[in-house]
Amino acid sequence: MAEKTEKPTAKKLRDAAKKGQTFKARDIVALVVIATGALSAPALVDLTRVAAEFTRIASTGAQPNPGAYALAWAKLFLRIAAPFVLLCAAVGALPSLVQSRFTLAVESIRFDLTALDPVKGMKRLFSWRSVKDAVKALLYVGVFAITVRVFADLYHHDVFGLFRARPALLGHMWIVLTVRLVLLFLLCALPVLIVDAAVEYFLYHRELKMDKHEVKQEYKESEGNHEIKSKRREIHQELLSEEIKANVEQSDFIVANPTHIAIGIYVNPDIVPIPFVSVRETNARALAVIRHAEACGVPVVRNVALARSIYRNSPRRYSFVNQDDIDGVMRVLIWLKEVEAANRGGPPREMPPEATHAPDAHGGDAASGGATSAQAGERNA
């Protein structure tokens, strides 16, 4: 069996998330819920109403109806506890959704009998995650002992002074001391939580590691084999009409952006010396134009700034290039003629200083333009 040494791919992580296998730092979720509950308890949990109710019953000595009495206490409990519980539930759900990247694990909902396999249960019992949980539990015991000691040193006067407090304030003081104890525990446990999250992240990626064969197979499935790629090229070709294909073939070059815009440039000095926009396509049709141009030997110059400028300043096909873009177009034409002359073996004439840097200044792709310009010269000849 091949050793799994490769990191999980994005597709592997997405497929695992659909099965419920996501990175889950449960202690961080618990930390957020407990901290939110501790901070919101003094404002949301009002025990003075409970104390006032007990005081009223004790002072009047009335004998209420048991059913009505229980119903009144239930309503009071819901009014006090419902906002607190809803807030904690909402705060607890948010970190879980963020960790799962808002992915619904639909495949984990189905009934799976393999989860009852005792062999898998034994493997989980003696796994690295079980060792991590055991060590974490021991660390939490130590953290709790330290928390109690520090809390006793800081607040023992407040604890022993509770017997002198008024009954109406007793509940509020207990809540305040409990909140302080909880926050102190969370502060002491924070290093353990961080280490636990880091180890959990490492174990999660370790479980999803892939061997090289799996990576190659996944790449083949996602990118497709040669037959599928050929079919995709055929689909791109079908996006173009015969008129567009003819315009591409007659163009002097195609300037691309590099995949979202394709502009065809045609120049005929015998008719008019101004460059002419013969093709103007975007998105999938632009990709089809680029593929067809490469297949026909028409130079393709990948120049983001020039392509965007021509597309913006020349809003229609079969229009002249705007005067703001003529300089850039002519620089590309001069450069292509120099490359064509060099590929034919003839001595290229010396370019003027402002044209020698045309490919770099406009982002021209020398490899693409140079490789296809020779074919273009043979076609034009």
From Swiss-Prot:
UniProt keyword list: Cell membrane, Membrane, Transmembrane, Transmembrane helix, Virulence
Gene Ontology CC annotation, any one: plasma membrane
Keyword Protein biosynthesis carried by entry: no
Alphabetical list of InterPro entries matching this protein: BsaZ-like, T3SS_substrate_exporter, T3SS_substrate_exporter_C
One GO term of the biological process aspect: protein secretion
Transmembrane segments: 28-48, 80-100, 134-154, 175-195
Annotated localization: Cell membrane
SUPFAM superfamilies assigned: EscU C-terminal domain-like
Low complexity bias locations: 364-381
Membrane topology type: Multi-pass membrane protein
Chain residue ranges for the region called Disordered: 343-381
One Pfam family it belongs to: Bac_export_2
Function description: Part of the bsa type III secretion system, is involved in the intracellular replication of invading bacteria inside the host cell. Probably necessary for the lysis of the vacuole membrane and escape into the host cell cytoplasm.
Family designation: Belongs to the type III secretion exporter family.
Name of this protein: Secretion apparatus protein BsaZ
Organism: Burkholderia thailandensis (strain ATCC 700388 / DSM 13276 / CCUG 48851 / CIP 106301 / E264)
